[in-house]
Amino acid sequence: MSFAPVYSENSHALILGTWPSPKSREMAFYYGHPQNRFWPMMAALTGEPVPAREDIEAKKGIILRHGLALWDTLESCTITGASDASIRDVVPNDIASLLAKAPIEAVFCNGATAYRIYTKYLLPVSGIPAVKLPSTSPANAACRPETLREVWGEALKDYITVSNL
């Protein structure tokens, strides 16, 4: 089973991954692999300190204080290790339930697999076209951290809000 979505009534942009990696499942939260660049990148984009790897509340705070939401495209699947290429038996998450609770205006997919799954299973339900962003996974090491910050920052610039919490 996937993790619960992180969102509030102030979440206007949804960031979607594919499925939690083994390290994320071990940590019981999104992007738990120590080499994943997601949390350092989001901290840089929001002006927040980089949260400690095990500080789930600080990570949730980065998302919630800045008008974002975080979830995965899949509720369940069969996967070998952390290889997105091995994903089969997919069950997509119920995006309609999230959209009924949060005023999501934009969807951003963390990597090509999340984008492909979103487009196939979730776009017909949401009606919101997604933006495919380069994966923050350590498997995408060819994409430098500076490039990730630049591309993600440009995509999210109109959606990252100033904290009022």
Predicted regions and their residues:
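Structural motif
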Residues: 12-13, 106
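Short, solvent-exposed loop/turn segments at secondary-structure junctions
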Residues: 20-23, 36, 75-78, 112-115, ...
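Short polar/charged helix/loop
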Residues: 50-51, 116, 122
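Internal catalytic-core helix/loop-beta-alpha segment
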Residues: 65-113
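Catalytic phosphate/metal-binding cores of nucleic-acid and nucleotide-processing enzymes, i.e., regions
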Residues: 106, 112-115, 124-129
